């Protein structure tokens, strides 16, 4: 996985620089997400590994209908370099670069029960204050947390779940 990320990084940066120059973060993000989704399909991955598949055919297979010429050239470069299987990593890195440029933190909030609108707003406000950035939150429910929530925002994980507190208490008592 780390090798794939290392190989994908320069392509993600190049795509990001191009999108920034074109002022087209959203279209590039959408196109990369589409291409990554298609490339991740096992049947398509097998087809992309076939040396008889031409560059133009690979680009036609992976490019969304509403893409620009620059995006087609980007896919062609990936095809020529045999890097099309890296599209999921490239897409993820592009989105991370975009979020950083737009001063947005993406946070995943996993709670033991469904959060109310007020609770979610309070979490967003606290995260906005902590990171001094806009916050995009996705939520999930995991009953095994027993109570509370786990917030994963970038490099920061805040475990306020009862399951986490019990695990820390057990570790403290064992020492």
Curated annotation (Swiss-Prot):
Primary residence = membrane
User: Does the entry feature the keyword Transport, yes or no?
Assistant: yes
- Location(s) in or outside the cell: Cell inner membrane
A Pfam family in this protein? OSCP
Q: Which SUPFAM superfamilies match?
A: N-terminal domain of the delta subunit of the F1F0-ATP synthase
Q: Does the keyword Cell membrane apply?
A: yes
Superkingdom of origin? Bacteria
What is the membrane topology listed in the Swiss-Prot or TrEMBL record? Peripheral membrane protein
Annotated Gene Ontology cellular component terms: plasma membrane; proton-transporting ATP synthase complex
MF terms in GO: proton-transporting ATP synthase activity, rotational mechanism
Its keywords, alphabetically, are: ATP synthesis, Cell inner membrane, Cell membrane, CF(1), Hydrogen ion transport, Ion transport, Membrane, Transport
Which protein family is it in? Belongs to the ATPase delta chain family.
How does the record describe its quaternary structure?
Answer: F-type ATPases have 2 components, F(1) - the catalytic core - and F(0) - the membrane proton channel. F(1) has five subunits: alpha(3), beta(3), gamma(1), delta(1), epsilon(1). F(0) has three main subunits: a(1), b(2) and c(10-14). The alpha and beta chains form an alternating ring which encloses part of the gamma chain. F(1) is attached to F(0) by a central stalk formed by the gamma and epsilon chains, while a peripheral stalk is formed by the delta and b chains.
User: Per its database record, what is this protein's job?
Assistant: F(1)F(0) ATP synthase produces ATP from ADP in the presence of a proton or sodium gradient. F-type ATPases consist of two structural domains, F(1) containing the extramembraneous catalytic core and F(0) containing the membrane proton channel, linked together by a central stalk and a peripheral stalk. During catalysis, ATP synthesis in the catalytic domain of F(1) is coupled via a rotary mechanism of the central stalk subunits to proton translocation. This protein is part of the stalk that links CF(0) to CF(1). It either transmits conformational changes from CF(0) to CF(1) or is implicated in proton conduction.
* Full protein name: ATP synthase subunit delta
Provenance organism: Stenotrophomonas maltophilia (strain R551-3)
Instruction: Give the organism's phylogenetic lineage.
Output: Bacteria, Pseudomonadati, Pseudomonadota, Gammaproteobacteria, Lysobacterales
Its gene name is atpH
């Amino acid at each position: 996985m780390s090798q794939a990320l290392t190989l994908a990084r320069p392509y993600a940066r190049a795509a990001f620089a191009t999108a920034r120059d074109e002022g087209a973060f959203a279209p590039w993000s959408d196109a990369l997400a589409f291409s990554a989704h298609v490339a991740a399909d096992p049947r398509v991955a097998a087809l992309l590994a076939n040396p008889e598949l031409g560059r133009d055919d690979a680009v036609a297979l992976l490019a969304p209908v509403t893409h620009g010429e620059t995006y087609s050239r980007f896919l062609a470069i990936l095809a020529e370099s045999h890097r099309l299987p890296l599209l999921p990593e490239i897409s993820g890195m592009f989105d991370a670069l975009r979020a950083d440029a737009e001063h947005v933190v993406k946070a995943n909030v996993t709670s033991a029960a469904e959060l109310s609108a007020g609770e979610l707003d309070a979490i967003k406000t606290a995260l906005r204050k902590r990171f001094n950035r806009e916050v995009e939150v996705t939520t999930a429910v995991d009953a095994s947390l027993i109570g509370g929530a786990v917030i994963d925002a970038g490099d920061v994980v805040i475990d306020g779940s009862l399951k986490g507190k019990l695990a820390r208490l057990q570790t403290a008592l064992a020492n």
